[in-house]
């Protein structure tokens, strides 16, 4: 299945708009290039709607969060939704601070995300409206492991169904759940 997904990306060579963590921006660009896409980075509110319009998808990462980037995230997300483009959210640090948590919750309320990926604490914060995260790391008491795997799978399936999105919990074990796919998306 992964080969088919990569073949599809290479065939379409989409431009992907990224509003991402400044620390990883180069890595994100290189991964997109390696997969056959073409990255462009912009979080400037006056720029994002135009940039999003020429792209095939949007990647939003809360790693480097500030008020200007939030405005850019919302504008780009709304424009992507208008265009029917897939939108990915990485809610870095949701649950670690009120500012990050409120931002992540506002984003998932206002924007339809195709993919939501984060550690278990971040995803639970999105699902329940509050949570605790140790910086950008999951709370170790919540980590997905062999003992709680079935419970974690039930949780992620329920959240994926509620958000009509592919949901990925990252960690030692990486459960993925999807219930609805649009014509242009591949699991």
Stretch-by-stretch model annotation:
Residues 100-178:
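Conserved phosphate/ATP/ADP-binding segment of small-molecule kinases
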Residues 180-187:
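Single conserved hydrophobic/aromatic residue that forms the stacking wall/gate
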